[in-house]
Amino acid sequence: MFFVYRSNQIDILFTKICKIIKKKPLLNIFEREIIIHDNEILFQNLNTFIANHTGIAADFKLIYPNVFIWKLFKQVFSDIQLNNIFSRSTITWKIMKIIEENDFCKFVQKKDKIMKKFEFSFLMSHLYQQYILYRPNWINMWEKNKKNTLKIEKKDEWQAKLWIKIILYTEKLQQSKWHFSNLFKKFKTLKKIEHIKFPKRIFIIYSISLNPKYMEIFKKISTYTDIYFLSINACEKKIFHISFAKNYVVQKNNLLMNLSEKYEKFYFLFFKKFKKIKYNNFFQKNNSNNLLNIVKNDFLNFKEKENLLKKNSFLLKDNSISINICCDKKHEIEVLYNKLLSFFNEDSKLKPSDIVITSFSLNTYIIYINSIFKSKNKKEKIPFYISKKHSDKIEKILFIFNKILNLPNIRCNNEEILDLIEIQDIRDKFDISEEEINILYEWIEKANIRWGLHENEKQKNNLIFIKKNQNTWFYGIKKLLISHAINEEEEVWNNVLSCTSINTSRTELIGKLINFIKVLDQWRDKLFFSKKIKSWRPLFLCFIKDFFYKNEKIRDSIDIINKTWTKMIDDATLSNYEKKIPISILKKKFSHIMNNFSEKKFLPGVINFCHPSLVCYIPFKIKCIIGAEYQEIPKKKLSSFNLIDKYPLTSDLHICKENYIFLQNFISTQETLYISYVGHSLKNNNKVRSSILIDQLLNHITSNFYVSEHHDYKNNKKEIFEHICKKHKKENLYEKKQVNKINLNTLQKTKKINQEIYNKIFSIKNRIISTSTQISLKSLISFWKNPIRYFFNYTLNIKLKIAKRNIITEPFSINLFDDFKISNIIFKKILNNESIKDEFKKIILSGILPYGHFGSILLKEKKKEIENIVKAIYKYRISSPKKENFDIKIEKYNINGCLDEIQNTGLLRWKLGTINYRDRISLWLEHLIYCILGGTGESKIIGYKKNFFSFYPLSSHLAYNYLFTYIEGYMKGMKNPLLLIKSGSNWFDKVYDKKNDCIKKNDDIKRKAYKILYHTWMGNEYITGEKEDLYIQQIISELNVKKICKISQKWFTPILKHQKK
């Protein structure tokens, strides 16, 4: 017998299961109750429910619908060998084989690249799998070569021809041609099912993946066993029944109709055509105590209120449904976290297990969930679990496996290889410690290893480079070995330059590095060339052997992945595809298989994050749906080839899957439904629409509720919208524009390092600051070059050292440090009229320079630039330079130090780079001392590309007053940080009017000056902004432009005022 139990609550249906089991217990105590469903979480919930509510220890067995049907076919047709030859993987490779030999379709040709052929085959295999399940009549007709009887357009008939070729090819391989479509047809023709022992009863809980054809099979076997079909319905009425339809005109925007039309329509028509079906309705009205339950009751009774007298009053205190519009995904999780805290604060009885958070695009939120839910303080920590596709162990292995499979596609630059070494499992395999990682970074930088394992790699990658070892891993290792052997700095041996300052006690680390690079080289060779499918079969186990210690902790995970890999290869082998294939195709195929794999775990006692389908029937007090944008619910489907979408049927329930899941989550929410989505595009800040389902829900509420009888529809709608839809703004919007791009991870690390010390020191009102009146010129200059860093280093004794592992990966440019080093070497030689031939050879062999002629040109240009600087120095270095020690008294302070390079014309300074504000302030302070000591010349500094800066001579009295002012500024800056920064200096350079000694009045110039300040602060992809400075980050929580400009004006005015034009 076939029983249909309908209800709007899953718990009621669970209770009915309990009563049936109690009333008609199974005679065989070893027999298990059969539950057919595809959701393990619901099955766990059923077991928990029965244990909590009845005390029955029933032995349930969960069987997936497709597994049950295939097993049934095997029993019914025991004389047929059923091997599921028509799996998606096997069909893919059979299509590949066919299109290698035939040009029968305009979309793909024999001459096309193998990846294009694979993608086409992969797509078509997916469509044929759907046709087999949802259009068995098409498949059966195609196999009889009756294409025209199906009323499919002529332009689509190529799909039928391709399927016929697949069947013919299967027969040619002497494989079974049985699949669901022809088995279903054969099963339907059976008058009697014999020699099968059916269970006493079967419980079927409806799910959207329950194929309508499966339902026909279940109906057929209900003659031999009791089938209990448990259906969760939002609506009690049979909305497609003739008697009901006459009295109700369906509105186009009716929310329930849009959500459940196909489902309701199909099952009404399906059950109507069968006899011997017993219906049992167990619907229960929701307590009408809030907006959520009133809407659910509207669904239950299928009501739409047309006039004000029938509408419900909307209470502005009601928050049972809320729609939250956020700025970005991270902000969405921050808002959610704060909302969860308020839920717990408002209800002391609320438990984490009473709340569930769902998303159709959960993977895009995982990084933010972990960072926000784990980073909050312990008092506010919320226990949570993310239901991911794979366990952490499987994810870790897959991550490394994909990295290794991608070796043929990378250039093996230093960052890519070091990223691999830093993975814990790889480090353990090659016995490399954390400390040794830091040493490797240093060695790689000194050996100038950039990219390529060896010179042949560059040819392999088809890059336009000369065959040269320079900057490769093996050449860099050779340099390290020579450095250890000769133990001297920068010596040339056999035309290889040794590295400087290499720790010779770390010989074993070079051995580990050589071993690792050799293994990578072997894998690049292994993966670089295409192979026959069978040859790829042992690949995964080889990977585990080379990169992992196979321990008990990961054994199960390795077995799961290996079984999946080998099954994929074995399925492909069944197709008899003989051509060689690249690893990129198998990588893509394997990624798809693993992405469809799901563990479906649910942790008790915490807030679970999961896909909405896992909990759509399970009641929770609070349900949260995040990521409810229009492109996510429902997801847009590309159906250019899909004939199911082109020729739809009422039975195509899977097409509206997201709608149905949303509806079920809605009706299973008990107290509060929280919905959120990102309301603005990150690309262009345009408004992003919410899901159409959210819009329809809002339309239903505004059409059926009112705030005040005195308001018209428009005003009522506006008030309801404003209450339900909450637009969340990011705090400190000004800060967001100016400061928010700070690297938050780095900042958090910094704060973690020194927050306690920082708070402790700043909490002491009377800090002990050195009040010594003895000040060295060196300290004074060091302070004014960077007052904030000096304050931290010398007043607070805090030095922020966050490791920056930014190493050069490209051989096209020189980093700033190497550029300075080269310039300094050449400068000293030219200044002292010494030969630079040997130094040039060392520089070329070091690998610092770009390849070939590029490096030679760069070196010549560098030499030319430095020669120009030296010429300028000789122009002003008329006499032999003098040096003078001094100790002068400025009010109560004694300033001591030494001035060098004193010419008759004044102080002479030079720099091999561009002159910046720190160079100018340094020269200014020295110039003040020079003038106080009686100097009457101009102090000047010569820089790169004829850059020149000088000061007019000052009277001793004026210089004395200025120096006293800067000393007082120094003493104050030692107590409280002085906000004198480059952003302010650049602003002041633009806006200062030297002629009138004031700020320029022109508004256009002012705007440009503020723009310069902003760009200096923010930086760009080439230049790091000042906002990234860790010391500044500790002082400034938001950009205070007014304060920065005021301080800059005070301290830079004397410098620009006395600057020589």
UniProtKB/Swiss-Prot annotation:
One of its GO terms (molecular function) is DNA binding. Keywords: ATP-binding, DNA damage, DNA repair, DNA-binding, Exonuclease, Helicase, Hydrolase, Nuclease, Nucleotide-binding. Disulfide bonds: none annotated. InterPro entries: DExx_box_DNA_helicase_dom_sf (IPR013986), P-loop_NTPase (IPR027417), RecC (IPR006697), RecC_C (IPR041500), Restrct_endonuc-II-like (IPR011335). It holds the Pfam family Exonuc_V_gamma. Transmembrane segments: none annotated. One of its GO terms (cellular component) is exodeoxyribonuclease V complex. CDD domains: RecC_C-like. GO terms for biological process: double-strand break repair via homologous recombination. In the RecBCD complex, RecB has a slow 3'-5' helicase, an exonuclease activity and loads RecA onto ssDNA, RecD has a fast 5'-3' helicase activity, while RecC stimulates the ATPase and processivity of the RecB helicase and contributes to recognition of the Chi site. A helicase/nuclease that prepares dsDNA breaks (DSB) for recombinational DNA repair. Binds to DSBs and unwinds DNA via a highly rapid and processive ATP-dependent bidirectional helicase activity. Unwinds dsDNA until it encounters a Chi (crossover hotspot instigator) sequence from the 3' direction. Cuts ssDNA a few nucleotides 3' to the Chi site. The properties and activities of the enzyme are changed at Chi. The Chi-altered holoenzyme produces a long 3'-ssDNA overhang and facilitates RecA-binding to the ssDNA for homologous DNA recombination and repair. Belongs to the RecC family. Heterotrimer of RecB, RecC and RecD. All subunits contribute to DNA-binding. This is RecBCD enzyme subunit RecC. It comes from Buchnera aphidicola subsp. Schizaphis graminum (strain Sg). The lineage of its organism: Bacteria, Pseudomonadati, Pseudomonadota, Gammaproteobacteria, Enterobacterales. The gene is recC.
